[in-house]
Amino acid sequence: MLDEAAYFLLGNIKIYYYGLHNALGALAAVIVLALCCRARRMPAGTAPLYAVLAMPLGVACSRVLFCLLDGRFRGIFSLRAMLCFWGGGHSMVGALLGAALAAVIAAKILAVPARRMLDMMVPALLMFIAFARVGEQYTEMLGRSRALVSEVWRQGWLVAGDEYALYLKTYVLEALCALILAAALLPGLLRGGRDGDTLLSAMLLLGCTQVLWESLRFDAHMRESFVSLQMLLYAVMFAAALLVFACRYARRLRHGWPVWLALGVIALTAGGVIGLEFMIDRSGVSRFVLYAPYVLLLALPAVCGFVFKKRSNLA
């Protein structure tokens, strides 16, 4: 971890609180996965096998994606620098990609449908995200917003400060959001609906909400100018889920208008968000005013996606 991250000593070993939260999150994820697998009567040993695959793949993909996309890392880019993963510098989207790859491999080994295995990992990964976000409070830069200028934010449990300014604790919002999404998606998973629906629903909801949280974050993590690169990756996530739901509905109708509507919604959302991001970063307009249409824009693909999902699943 970085030098400014908080740690404690266990003998002569430095234990970083952020790393400890990630480890606890991984343990919680395995426990949640094991319980879900038991409820859905998955093959014995599914959770341990997935854990063995997901942990190294998650770390590797997280590190590689960060090294490829972080502007600050490019100045020291080398294989040796990439391998120093314990010094900090990871991408949450990369970790999720590694976890998804592990689910596909585990499904092949266990001879179960890949989409079902991908569904099973969703609550577990959301639990991991919650722990990881809470751990960001023990770093100096991660998980906080731009400096707050409004007097409304002078006090409150969502506000933290230093000698320079006050900041919004975005890590709290992200952790709560992950837990809420896990609670919302778990009943559908346990009911045993259509394979892949839980994954796609998670991609849609997590993608839309994380675009908002990445906009609020201002920690220079994987940023280019006024845009967070992880925000773009989360946008691809919700766009992909929306298009899959639209294609399903189009096949059921035997007509292509849902796909064209989905593409229009994606274009409108992307254009609107980029414009609002520019104004948030460069203009003096109140952020309260700017984030109202921001939330409405991100709600549009989520609503469309779930309408398509519901209608495509009708008998």
Task: Report residues per predicted region.
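A feature for loop-to-transmembrane-helix boundaries and adjacent hydrophobic helices
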Residues: M1-A315
